[in-house]
Amino acid sequence: MATLGAWDYTILAVVLIISVAIGIYYRFVGGKQSTTTEYLLADRSMNVAPVAFSLMASFMSAVTILGVSMENYQYGTMFVVINLSYVLSTPVAAYLIIPVFYRLKTASVYEYLELRFGYATRLAASLSFSLQMVLYMGIVVYAPALALEAVTGLSQVFSIVIVGVVCTFYATLGGMKAVLITDIYQSLLMFAAVFSVIICAWVKAGSLEVIWRVAQENGRINLTNFSVDPTERHTWFTQILGGCATYLAIYGVNQTQVQRLMAVKSLSAARAALWWCLPILCLLSLSTCFSGLCIYWYYRDCDPLLEGRVNSRDQVMPLFVVDTMGEYTGLAGLFVSGIFCASLSTISSIISSLAAVTLEDYLKPLVSCCAKRTLTDRQTLWYSKLLSLFFGALCIGMAFMAGSIGGLLQAALSIFGIIGGPLLGLFTLGMYVTKANEKGAIGGLLISLAFCFWIGFGQPKPPLVSLDMSTAGCPVDRSFARDIFLKTVIAVAEEEHYFYLYRISYMWYAALGFLITFFGGWLLSWLFALLKWDNNRRIYQDADCTLIKHDLFVPPIAKRLQRRQMPLLVVTGTSSEIGGITTESATAPPRLDEIEWEKHKAVA
């Protein structure tokens, strides 16, 4: 077992110390984290750059570096096509979804669902998100522990605890500002880790052309799978359609990302952060994909898993570091630091978002209902910090359970698809369909979640079959390799006997969840309204149900509703119900002012 040198440990220690120092710094400067808004939303004063980097780092973490590289090593480059879905989905998130949330100015994205449908819908969605993040955090902490075990021999227990403690410390102490600033330099170290692999392979191969040619000769360069079969793991359709649904579930309606977008100064800044995140995200994705080809070039004649040197594909990248970077002082430490940072940035984001959701969606309503009072800002801040500590401890516990999960990349994207897809459908239903009601929305969500969990976790599933791996250049006996190969061949031959829904590609989970929630909720809403079991009165501003709260819908629909309601505007009193609180106003609704009405009459 190889070990890190003194310079490697020095680099790793400096990286951890900087993260802790940033947390301490933001605890004692500026507002000193003395208000809930500053602690959870950075006082809504952040610039575009840190938010853009944080949007990327929050989810494209150690799972990306270890998982995507092995995806290309083992299955080829078809996964690269998913970057097109990022390009297609960014304008949808920036110009349709985010404006709706930005108007709310709230710490929890799920408050929208209470305004649109009711508290029961908000609670159901918030609980689903919490489950999603708790499952995901285990994978994220487990990944760097796996890397350190392969590179240094340090136990997974020690590595998991170090990552969890450091991350929890600076996130709890420094709040959102510390999280966003650390994400910048942690993102740069993530890139450094990936490019250290590429450059090392480049030096040893002599040119990038050699690496590309070897990958091409061995079937790794594959961008022509246009199959419409949903059971094929990666095709153009799975990557673009499934990728769009996954991207929007993460960057459009996920609390962790929207909370970052709420930390900037204006809606235009939030849109700019999303657009700047796009090239950063694609650059990391593409470079990580190519790093997988670099690693394949090095092990093309002796696959480490078939040789028995590692226990899973996710350990191959750290093994490459052991085999190639030891001669370069500090380079292995740089790689391990990048893996650490990839995990730290994600966990800190998850801790912050779970604290915000628990406070806003569970604790505050509970206190209001049971104690008949509201929390002061000082109490809210104190509870936020306690919740951050709790979720930091929870992420350490979940990491110990992640070792039983298979491939990191597929596990992570499956979780986002199974839960994120239905949540995307729920928000889309609320923002696009004025006739949707609460019972229909909850019914669609529950049906979709049940279906996605069924196909996502139902067993037995056919094992994943990789492209050909060679052991011709290995110096030891190949009996172990032959056993694995024979088991794989048998599994492929019997794949058609598996239940069809269990064979569906994991990339379709988000799209299927979205469609079932959206159309199922739409149909159920129509049925419940027909039977007079529910209505959609919450979307109206007045008691007569004539003026719709257009801000609850995406901008194109909101503008259409505005124009339609212009003749209904009066200067007399109107009733406005927001979040269950009814208020009386002596003027027209504030979002439909008299100036717009005068312009409308002039045009007419």
UniProtKB/Swiss-Prot annotation:
Tree of life domain: Eukaryota
GO cellular component: plasma membrane
Gene Ontology terms for molecular function: symporter activity
Glycosylation sites: N222, N225
PROSITE patterns according to UniProt: NA_SOLUT_SYMP_3 (PS50283)
Compartments where found: Cell membrane
Transmembrane segments: 4-24, 48-68, 78-98, 134-154, 160-180, 188-208, 234-254, 273-293, 331-351, 389-409, 413-433, 440-460, 511-531
Main location group: membrane
Record-stated family: Belongs to the sodium:solute symporter (SSF) (TC 2.A.21) family.
Protein's name in the database: Putative sodium-dependent multivitamin transporter
Organism name: Drosophila melanogaster
